[in-house]
Amino acid sequence: MYQILIGCVWQKSPYINQCTEFQPPLSFVTPERMRRFMRCWARLELVYMLAWIVTTKLVKATRLDFTWGPGEPKRILEASCGSGPIMKGQLFTSPNIKNLLNRTTGIMVKAHCNPPEAILWVDTPPKPVWVNPFAVVQGLAEDVTNGNMPQDFKEKLLFALDDSLSQSQSSPDEILGPPPLGCFTGPFFLSPPKSKDIAEGLKDSCIPASYYANLQKT
């Protein structure tokens, strides 16, 4: 399959041979040989370009791309737990988005994750925002409780919200409220009298998100 020519190894290929075989000094290069060289160079450039495009597409197909369009919230629910950028050791602080209340068009809660994930879908531009799941579920429960809707529907919705947290062995305490910003857990994880101390501000119950991120790595 290979031949030796002027100390160089070249493969029997109608295109590669023309590009790799020995060329005489520049003073002996004819216009025909120059045109042949340019054609070979163009072919090689095309091969490299196609290989780069294919490689780029394959890499993008194996990771979660955080550039979102209006019809792509479903991709968030299909993604594995911990795929959101907020889950990678960052604390749950207030989202840095102006007018968040009026710009939020949807709320998603991934209850099967441990800890659960809550994502706000924000418009203009459309994108997901990972937020404190316990605070979100607590806020939704309060809205449903005070909302003007049929009682049977209200009870079913409250049960679904409570179940979204009970899947991860936790449920919010209605009196003590949601955990502080930057924390996953809250007073509802502890039994009295510790819960009373936390409610009165005598004890801190904050466990940062980085704690759960480290658990996922181990």
Curated annotation (Swiss-Prot):
Function: The heterodimer glycoprotein H-glycoprotein L is required for the fusion of viral and plasma membranes leading to virus entry into the host cell. Acts as a functional inhibitor of gH and maintains gH in an inhibited form. Upon binding to host integrins, gL dissociates from gH leading to activation of the viral fusion glycoproteins gB and gH.
UniProt membrane topology term: Peripheral membrane protein
Subcellular location: Virion membrane; Host cell membrane; Host Golgi apparatus, Host trans-Golgi network
Protein name: Envelope glycoprotein L
GO cellular component, one term: host cell Golgi apparatus
Entry-linked InterPro entries: Herpes_gL_C, Herpes_gL_N, Herpes_gL_N_sf, HSV_GL_alphagamma
Family label: Belongs to the herpesviridae glycoprotein L (gL) family. Alphaherpesvirinae gL subfamily.
Principal location class: virion
Keywords: Disulfide bond, Fusion of virus membrane with host cell membrane, Fusion of virus membrane with host membrane, Glycoprotein, Host cell membrane, Host Golgi apparatus, Host membrane, Membrane, Viral envelope protein, Viral penetration into host cytoplasm, Virion, Virus entry into host cell
High-level lineage: Viruses, Duplodnaviria, Heunggongvirae, Peploviricota, Herviviricetes
